[in-house]
Amino acid sequence: MFPLGVLKKEQVGSVGVLRLSLPFATNATDTSGNAIPTRTAQGTPTYSSGSLLLDNDDVIATGTTDGQVQSSLNTVGKGWQLEFDVKMIATEYRGILYKSIYTSVGFPCLYLEQSTGLLRLRSYLNQDVFTVNVGLDMSAAFFNVKIVQTANTDYPKLYINNNLIATCLFGGDLFGDSSNQAGFVFGTGSNSTGFKIKNFKFYTT
């Protein structure tokens, strides 16, 4: 069964406590107050006009080394919310972020594809949480993506520019069942055009 229910538009506030805040205006420093370390895992990311360009093989990741757990980013048994502003450069399918402490792990992940307007979110078990057309030109301007799972047992909801677009039809620990998912990785990690990102925030209950 296609795991989406398209709903009426509505507004949403923040869920839980801010754990990670990466404005990506001039660097990848966490401004949440939790001092979560980040690093350039590969490539040469570019900061310009208040945003981060992740192009070619550029990758930004939490932790000072690969595989370093950030316990406050663990979502096991919790509700969570993530949000960010993004503008696509590539027209093809691109990985925007991965919920992992390892740069080589492919899931959980969020993908965007400018040519079709599709957003895809896959769980740590590679389940299809969302596959939905966001209904706008991803390259025209920055747009806001917000995904909220209020509690572990609730169904995640997808908001675009603060308007509810869709809801998943199942809940659970979609973002992982261990500390292996207690981190984030940003970037395509491949020799291709990418995207611009800013104002990333992550909350847990």
What function would you assign to each model-found segment?
Residues 121-144:
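Short, aromatic/His-centered strand-loop micro-motif at the edge of beta-sheets
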Residues 168-196:
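Flexible glycan-contacting loops in extracellular carbohydrate-active proteins
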Residues 140-150, 156-158:
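Short tryptophan-centered beta-strand motifs in secreted/extracellular beta-sheet-rich domains
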Residues 95-121:
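Glycan-recognition/cleft segments
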Residues 20-49, 54:
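Short, tryptophan-glycine- and acidic/Ser/Thr-enriched carbohydrate-recognition patches
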Residues 1-23, 201-205:
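Enriched but not universal
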Residues 67-90, 106-109, 200:
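A carbohydrate-recognition surface predominantly in extracellular/luminal proteins
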